[in-house]
Each structure stands twice: as structure tokens, then as C-alpha cells.
């Protein structure tokens, strides 16, 4: 594996240049999951993100990385992408073969799963930070630091053997270093140019309050709903004046169908202590104009509001039909 990857590296470096980091950065992350059921069956899938967006995927059934965005090629040429695809094809076949060889050398047996995570982030002054870690059954085993493989602090003793074998392969180490510290930052720089409009998209949230099912006698469950915001990072808190309420419970940030996000934050309080509470929302799309909603004790849920509005329309419609019917019948009586 090392010799072949090293030769590929020497050929590739002839056409790849240096990069300059842009002012705004988005972390690039990839995750590889490889499942080994036995000595002959294995599956490897890969996912890649730039910030919150997923520009690539690599399914086990495919020999190439698939573009998920129209701007996924970045500023790389077709030739550069073709060579990268070849590098990863060599890597995947070599990885599977090498893992099977390690299984013969080390304690343990099939089935097992390996997770490999890595990525890079561009920082000011043309600096980048990169990382690469490997885990077995979700427990860290080793990482790539500088130009060497290093065993994780709580890794089993056999991880030292794996690191020793990997560190003897100078060609592969140089290829990994090149991919992490040269190619990854250059790829991210290009993606931030071609995907600029989508990466920097800002959508303002809307927020509303509700009261949930009573958690007990003389107790209230207050809900603060925030929806339709993008990007994902958001800060929502129940407040009393300028003080944060320590009992605030935040749910998971959930995706909407339009690629924006939704969050519900709750607070359980005594009925007599609800007055004076407010929900505060901070988001990048709002600038310094935070959303502040005050609890007045008369809030009803948005669902109930919708039901009431529908009821009003139904009553108006029925009333209109009755009025029309009576008027029409009166005209018939006159004629």
C-alpha cells in the first residue's frame, strides 16, 4: 500500500499548488464506517460535510465519490478530481486488505466495526488545522499527529503494534500528511468560493410561546418554539429580567423540510412564578436584534390558535350559507 500511494503522491504534487486561507472558514469533516462481518464480507461507506452542508458521499456500491451539490467540484480541475478519485480507490482496497491482515496478527475476531474520522479547517493567516482519528467499536484507538501514528491514551495494548507497523510505511505517512495538510485545505478554499451563496445563507427565525400539559398541581410547562432559521447554531433561553433561568430544558435541533431548523425550549415553573418570564432568541441572521417574547400568562399554543382560526372560518361559512338560504327562500316566497 505504501509504495503505490507514495508513487501516486509524487505524481500528484506536480500539478497541485499552495493555498491561501479566506477570511471566513467552515470546518470540513469526513466519516468512514467500515463493517467487517467475517474474513470475506465487508462494507465501507463515507460521508463528508462542509459546515452543515454535505457536498459528498461515498457509498460501498460505488467506486467513486459522489457529488451532492452543483458546486462540489470546487476549483479543482477534472484531472485533479480524477487523480483524487484514484487515490481513494487505492486507499479503500488497501485498507480492507490491511485490516484483514491485522486481524490475523492481533487478539479479537469478527464481527467488528471501524470508524475513521478526519478533516481540516482554514484559519486566518493562511493556517490550517487538520486531524485524523481511528476508532474500533466507537472507542478511540489511534490518531495521526505530525508525521506519525500515535496510540490513543486508553487504547488496548495491541494498538501499539498497529502504530509500529503503520509508522514503518513512510510512503503512506507522507500521502496522509499531504491529503490532510495540502489537499484538504485547498479543497475547502475552493468549495468556499463555488458554494459561497449557500454556505453564507442566512434565514431569520420566527418564534412563539405555548403552554404544554400541566406537569403537576399548580405547575406550568412553558414552551418557546423557534423555527425556520439557518444556519443551525442558535441560542434560546428562558429569562427572568437579564438572568437566565437554570431550569431551561433544550430539545434537539430538528430539520425542517425546507432545510431550515426548529428548536423547542421548555421551562417548568410554579403557576405563581410565571409572570415576568421571557424567552430570548439569538441567531446570526438577527445581528444584535434578539427576539424577546414575554410570557403574559394568557398564551395559548400555536396549534390551538390554528384550530380557533379554522373554527371561526367554519362558523362564518356556515353563517353565510344560512343567510344565503334564507334570503333565497324569501325571494321564492315573494315570487
UniProtKB/Swiss-Prot annotation:
Residues 18-304 are extracellular. It is a single-pass type I membrane protein. PROSITE patterns: IG_LIKE (PS50835). Pfam families: C1-set (PF07654), MHC_I_3 (PF16497). Residues 1-17 form the signal peptide. Keywords: Cell membrane, Disulfide bond, Endoplasmic reticulum, Endosome, Glycoprotein, Immunity, Immunoglobulin domain, Innate immunity, Lysosome, Membrane, Signal, Transmembrane, Transmembrane helix. GO terms for molecular function: endogenous lipid antigen binding; exogenous lipid antigen binding; lipid antigen binding; lipopeptide binding. SMART domains: IGc1. The chain crosses the membrane at residues 305-325. It is found in: Cell membrane; Basolateral cell membrane; Endosome membrane; Lysosome membrane. InterPro entries: Ig-like_dom, Ig-like_dom_sf, Ig-like_fold, Ig_C1-set, MHC_class-I_related, MHC_I-like_Ag-recog, MHC_I-like_Ag-recog_sf, MHC_I/II-like_Ag-recog. CDD domains: IgC1_CD1. Antigen-presenting protein that binds self and non-self glycolipids and presents them to T-cell receptors on natural killer T-cells. Heterodimer with B2M (beta-2-microglobulin). Interacts with MHC II and CD74. During protein synthesis and maturation, CD1 family members bind endogenous lipids that are replaced by lipid or glycolipid antigens when the proteins are internalized and pass through endosomes, before trafficking back to the cell surface. This is Antigen-presenting glycoprotein CD1d. It comes from Ovis aries (Sheep). The lineage of its organism: Eukaryota, Metazoa, Chordata, Craniata, Vertebrata. The gene is CD1D.
Amino acid at each position: 500500500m505504501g509504495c503505490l500511494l507514495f508513487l501516486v503522491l509524487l505524481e500528484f504534487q506536480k500539478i497541485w499548488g499552495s493555498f491561501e486561507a479566506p477570511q471566513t472558514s467552515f470546518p470540513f469533516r469526513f466519516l468512514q464506517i467500515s463493517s467487517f462481518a467475517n474474513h470475506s464480507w465487508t462494507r465501507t461507506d463515507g460521508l463528508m460535510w462542509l459546515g452543515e452542508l454535505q457536498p459528498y458521499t461515498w457509498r460501498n456500491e460505488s467506486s467513486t465519490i459522489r457529488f451532492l451539490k452543483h458546486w462540489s467540484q470546487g476549483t479543482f480541475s477534472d484531472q485533479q478530481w480524477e487523480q483524487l478519485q484514484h487515490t481513494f480507490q487505492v486507499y479503500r482496497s488497501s485498507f480492507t486488505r490491511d485490516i484483514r491482515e491485522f486481524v490475523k496478527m492481533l487478539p479479537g475476531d469478527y464481527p467488528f466495526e471501524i470508524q475513521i474520522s478526519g478533516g481540516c479547517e482554514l484559519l486566518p493567516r493562511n493556517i490550517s488545522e487538520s486531524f485524523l482519528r481511528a476508532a474500533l467499536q466507537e472507542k478511540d484507538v489511534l490518531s495521526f499527529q505530525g508525521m506519525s501514528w500515535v496510540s490513543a491514551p486508553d487504547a488496548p495494548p495491541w494498538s501499539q503494534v498497529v502504530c509500529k507497523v503503520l509508522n514503518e510505511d513512510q510512503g503512506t505517512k507522507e500521502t496522509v500528511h499531504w491529503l490532510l495538510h495540502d489537499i484538504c485545505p485547498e479543497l475547502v478554499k475552493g468549495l468556499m468560493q463555488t458554494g459561497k451563496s449557500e454556505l453564507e445563507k442566512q434565514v431569520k427565525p420566527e418564534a412563539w410561546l405555548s403552554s404544554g400539559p400541566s406537569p403537576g398541581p399548580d405547575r406550568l410547562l412553558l414552551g418557546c418554539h423557534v423555527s425556520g432559521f439557518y444556519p443551525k447554531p442558535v441560542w434560546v433561553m428562558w429569562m427572568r429580567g437579564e438572568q437566565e433561568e437554570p431550569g431551561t430544558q433544550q430539545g434537539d435541533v430538528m430539520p425542517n423540510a425546507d432545510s431550515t431548523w426548529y428548536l423547542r425550549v421548555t421551562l417548568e415553573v410554579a403557576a405563581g412564578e410565571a409572570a415576568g418570564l421571557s424567552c430570548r432568541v439569538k441567531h446570526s441572521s438577527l445581528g444584535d436584534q434578539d427576539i424577546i417574547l414575554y410570557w403574559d400568562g394568557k398564551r395559548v399554543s400555536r396549534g390551538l390558535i390554528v384550530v380557533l382560526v379554522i373554527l371561526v372560518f367554519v362558523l362564518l361559512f356556515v353563517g353565510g350559507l344560512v343567510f344565503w338560504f334564507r334570503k333565497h327562500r324569501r325571494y321564492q316566497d315573494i315570487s
